[in-house]
A protein has these predicted regions:
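Phosphate-binding glycine-rich loop
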Residues: 26-73, 87-89, 97, 146-150
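Conserved active-site segment immediately N-terminal to the catalytic lysine
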Residues: 152-198, 244-248, 297
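Amphipathic, non-transmembrane alpha-helical secondary structure
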Residues: 16, 60, 109-117, 136, ...
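PLP-dependent aminotransferase-like
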Residues: 64-168, 175
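PLP-dependent aminotransferase class I/II
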Residues: 34-38, 46-47, 122-126, 131, ...
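N-terminal "arm"/small-domain region of PLP-dependent enzymes with the aminotransferase-like
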Residues: 1-26, 31, 247-249, 376
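Hydrophobic/aromatic ligand-binding patch that stacks against planar heteroaromatic rings
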Residues: 86-88, 180, 260
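Active-site PLP attachment segment
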Residues: 170, 183-233, 259
Length: 399
């Protein structure tokens, strides 16, 4: 049997809904996208959501709406995918990378606090693997540093402190302290890429908390303008009889979601609670199997105060370096089991080396990376395949 890491779970209902969208005559941003936005907002317990073509676009447009640019600093983790930091570069701001805490996937919050300056305008925590970060601690830090905050836009001034923008690409459906991811950070970006728990092939969504003195509809409209060339009407509004005329408010960007993408998402969202439950079952099987294996360390996806979305099953192999880790990956592949690594820290990548970052300054992030292997975890994985992964993984590590 060949076992992939994370294929999309697309069934006949998704296919039927896409066909219906194609037959409807409306395939770009339209009624299905608007309905998907409403359902995402309801699911996340927020007032509004906006759907775009990627989580990357969601984060970048948020930074642009905040007025963050050259001369500003944005803090994020060194242990993440490039999208988290690249959007900071896109707007001309300076990324400030923080090492992880010892033995953790989250930023070292003491180092994060010490990195805050008068130029710091936002912090982007990363909810890696689907586990929500400690936002209580993050908010405690940004609230304690209000005195040094220097807003440079009306929205920043209304927020009144450093903005917290969650990179929750992995964490749609996760919870912490009974609060749904999407209703915790000031702004929350989700990914619906093909490998994610809920997919629209490509795509993403953004939710946000109310800002005192700022109308939610105004915020939604700004995201519409930013994502559709600054056009005052979307394609759906322009098709209304006699409503052809529009204005271009600003020379903006093009990153809207289509109704074909939303058609997939609407069905995926109907199935999502069952998909999350299956992921929890699979994680339970892995956890129980590896509990007796003292060389394998795993994440705590579920606890008294949190429930993960179960997006990735990260393992760490004790007393293992990169060379042996990579050899294990090859040997798993020889048995037709695909695995992955999440993530190679950004300071090890050429782009970030060129920005002056050096992995020697991020020893904890490197320690998390050097012996990490991500095992298959997806809702098409059968119990038999899961047992095959477990038995082979333990066998290979033991020899």
């Amino acid at each position: 049997m060949k076992i992939p890491v994370s294929p999309p779970d697309i069934g006949p209902q998704e296919i039927e809904e896409v066909i219906a969208a194609l037959h409807s005559g409306w395939i770009t941003t339209g009624p299905r996208t608007k309905e998907f936005e409403k359902q995402i907002a309801a699911y996340c317990h927020t007032e509004r959501a906006v759907c775009l073509n990627s989580a990357t676009a969601c984060m970048e447009l948020t930074l642009r709406l905040l007025g963050i640019g050259p001369g500003d600093e944005v803090i994020t983790s060194a242990y993440t995918y490039t999208a988290t930091a690249s959007v900071i570069c896109h707007v001309g701001a300076q990324p400030v990378l923080i090492d992880t805490a010892l033995g953790s996937l989250e930023m070292d919050y003491e180092k994060m606090a010490n990195a805050i300056t008068e130029r710091t305008k936002a912090i982007i925590p990363v909810d890696l693997a689907g586990i929500v970060c400690d936002y209580d601690k993050i908010y405690g830090i940004v609230n304690a540093r209000k005195a040094c905050f220097r807003p440079s836009s009306p929205l920043q001034e209304a927020i009144g402190r450093i903005t917290v923008l969650a990179d929750a690409a992995h964490a749609f459906g996760a919870e912490r302290h009974g609060r749904k991811c999407g209703s915790i950070a000031d702004f929350t970006s989700f990914s619906f890429h093909a490998v994610k728990n809920l997919t629209t092939a490509e795509g993403g969504a953004l939710t946000w908390l109310p800002v005192a003195g700022i109308d939610n509809e105004w915020l939604y409209k700004q995201f519409q303008l930013l994502s559709l060339h600054g056009q005052s009407k979307d394609a759906l509004a322009k098709t209304q009889l006699g409503s052809w005329e529009y204005d271009i408010i600003a020379p903006n960007y093009k990153c809207n979601m289509t109704d074909i993408m939303a058609a997939i998402g609407l069905v995926q969202l109907q199935r999502y609670d069952r998909l999350l439950a299956r992921r929890r079952e699979l994680i339970g099987k892995y956890d129980r199997a590896f509990k007796a294996c003292d060389t394998i360390e795993v994440l705590a996806h579920y606890g008294n105060d949190h429930a993960s979305s179960g997006h990735l099953y990260l393992t760490r192999i004790k007393d293992t370096d990169e060379k042996r880790r990579n050899d294990i990956i090859v040997r798993m592949a020889e048995r037709d089991i695909a695995t992955n690594v999440h993530y190679k820290p950004l300071p090890m990548m050429t782009a970030y080396k060129n920005l002056g970052f050096d992995i020697v300054d991020f020893p904890h992030a490197y320690a998390m990376y050097r012996n990490e292997i991500t095992l298959p975890l997806h809702t098409r994985l059968t119990d038999e395949e899961t047992e095959y992964v477990i038995s082979n993984y333990i066998d290979i590590i033991s020899h």
